[in-house]
Amino acid sequence: MPDSEPLEPLNQESSSNTEQLKLSTTPNIPARPQTRPQKQSTTTTTTVPTDQDSTTETSLEKPLDNPQDELDELAHEIEKVLSDPVIPPRPQHGSSTKSSETQTEHKEHDFEPAHPAIPQRPTNKKETIQSEVGDHNNGLESKSDLKVNKETSDDSVSTDKDKVHIKPSIPTIPSRPQSRNLDFSEVDNTKPSTTPSIPARPQRQSTTTQDEYKPQASNTPDIVTRPQTKTEKSVSNEELDKPGDEPSSKDQDNERHTDDSNASKSILETEKAVAQEEKKAKKSDVDNKPSEPTTSTDSSTEPTAPARGFRLPLHMQQGSGPISTSTPVAGSEAELNSLNNSNTFGDGEVTPGNSDTKATFKNDEDVENENRTDSSSFDDDMETISQDNEDGEQDRRNRQETATEENAQESEAPQFETTIIESGETEERDGDDTDSGELYSEQQQNKEKEETVPATSTPKIPQRPPKKSSLSRATTNDSLTSLNSTSKPPKPVISKRPTTEESLSNIEPTIPSRPAINQIPSVGESQHEPIVPNRPGNKDLASSQKDTQVSVKSKPPPPKPKKLSSKIAAFQQQLFNPANASSEEDVSSTGSKQPESGIRKRSTENSVLSRFGGKAIPLPGMFNPNQMPKPSISHGEETSDDKEEKQESATANAPVRRTRGPRGKKLPKAVADAEVKTESRFAIESGKLWSIEFKKKIVEEKEIISTSVEDLKKPKILSENDEAGDESKETAVENEVIDNPEIPVKDELQHDVVDVVGHPEKDVVTGLDDDDEDVPPEVNERFIKDEEISNVGVERTIASETTTEKHSTDEEEVEEEAEVDSVDIPIRRVAVNTVDSTEVQKDVEDEP
């Protein structure tokens, strides 16, 4: 339970803190930037590591009179901050759920100060606002706020975490708002909504220079050094204000990261520098305060635009406005910030060299713009800046009065037109960073002018193109009026176009602003602008020269067609003879390779292989000399005859020109379109020259059977052949070998004889082999038995006819041998038994 006891005072302190936060929501934002300018001078050398550390530093800075006491308090607070990591172990030691819940609640409060720490500061700002209502004097409000902060810090001593988070937020806020409350009383009325986001950014800016954004802690010391070199405190204060306004929300986010990363740095070292810088800041604030009342009225009326000149809707711009207003330091610095806020609405960040680019544009036009009280983007020109320095506060007051009138006229007009115009100016201004101190002071004065007339920039948008289009500065004033009248028919230059026209031209001004930006780089060319009219003159001259040249060329038309004809001929040669053209090109490209080809050619021509293509000697029938590729002839070896032949072929292929006769007459179509038909002298005829037929040889068995019958018919044949006489006797002697007739077959013989008589061809077959002497005896004996049956009745006749002689001439023997080969063996043997007769052989010879 001992842990729960200290938790009760923490809860009380947290409740008191929440009440303070509720009381101060919107005014807290301006209060912190007031205290921050003091830190900015001090904390430029150091960066706050965390939100808690930043709050502790602010609490230490409260008693500026006694820096040693503050250092002692800071040492105690630092120890408390170091004890913050002990927060997680507490719930570990306290096993009870209640203690853990209370600890988690306190942890939530501890983590909240990073986000809620911003609203806590506004609570102190409310106190500072009350002190502002009492007095705008030097630092009195800050002292009263410091006392209140000390009381709150004493209440938070019970717990380390609550002390660390609550104390730094309370004491730091009152000291700064005292200087800035004067400004914010005027500015906060217009921008009460964005307080929570704004205080967080100023905390980080405190580490940097008087800027709202802490991430520029490294960049801010450079900005501070610039005003110091210029040796004017007022200029330095104004410069500090502008860089504070310039840093964008991105810079603020970066500063948050840098604060966390820089937690390791010692706080004691930073506190000493902070105490000294705060004293310097107070002195500068006291000196700059008399200039505040002039700027307060302007800041309230003019909406601030985000940095970098981005265009936002009106409600967004009003919400983002307090971010820029929270940055003003004190006294004149706050006034300059308000001026910067009004100008940044369209201009974005105002860099030191932005005005240099426009100095060449409007040395002559600024006088008319001032008389017209126009808050155009051209008010930032060097001439307007110099005039502002000379005029002083009286000119500013006059401009403010004119601004109020113009605001009354243009209040109805949408204000994002101003953002469009001024955004172009910011882009123009971004380039130059030199002479930052002088430019800051001059630009701030110009911003005051613009604050007086925030919405009058719309009619001036068309004015930019006339300046660019104008050939000389002397004629720019006339050209501006003429261009305004041409671009937009109404010419209320003095009245600056009523709101109705502006509502109609809301879309239009964006278009002229873009060409204005593009034409800005041509400022250096303004001196050369008289040359621009000469250029169109030159173009006209060139066109006239071209016309003269065309006329000159048109005079001698006859030579032109000749040139064209020659070109056409060459072109047609390429079309009709691409091979020749390519060969000519190859000649030029391969001129260096000619000797090699000649060497190779000699080696192949002199060898036997060249006859067969140069590879190998083929077998007979493999090589066809007609198919062998022709050897490439080297260009150096070409004879003059070859060149002449090529030239002749080129001329032959060249199109022949038509003979020019009377142009009006044309040949009849029958003649012009005559078609030549060529017919060959040879007629083609087709027919069958020969044919082949294949047939099988048919052998009849009847012939074999008839052999036995042929033997039977020979008696009659013999009777018919009795006239032969003695020639057949020899054959009969040989046939005496037949003996022993056993079976008489007379009927068969008679029947067969009749058949044999009807078949004389069969007799031829039988009579062929009558005189074969080569037949072996065994074969004869085997067939004799078969023939005895048929020859029984004929034996006596055979015996009587033995006187017949054998017909054995050499020719007959040769014929018989040929016929014997074609006849079967059994037929031969049957013939042996028969009686040969010369008549039968004669018949055979006579047959076809």
From Swiss-Prot:
Spans annotated as Disordered: 1-676, 717-740, 798-822
Tree of life domain: Eukaryota
Annotated Basic residues bias: 657-668
A GO cellular component annotation in the UniProt record: actin cortical patch
Residue ranges, compositional bias (Acidic residues): 377-393, 424-436, 810-822
Stretches with biased composition (Low complexity): 34-58, 291-307, 475-487
Cell compartment(s), UniProt: Cytoplasm, Cytoskeleton, Actin patch
Biased composition (Basic and acidic residues): 73-82, 103-113, 124-135, 142-165, 229-290, 359-373, 635-648
Alphabetized UniProt keyword annotations: Cytoplasm, Cytoskeleton
Keyword Mitochondrion applies: no
Biased composition (Polar residues): 11-28, 93-102, 190-228, 317-329, 541-552, 571-595
Family: Belongs to the AIM21 family.
Function: Involved in mitochondrial migration along actin filaments.
Protein name: Altered inheritance of mitochondria protein 21
Protein species of origin: Candida albicans (strain SC5314 / ATCC MYA-2876) (Yeast)
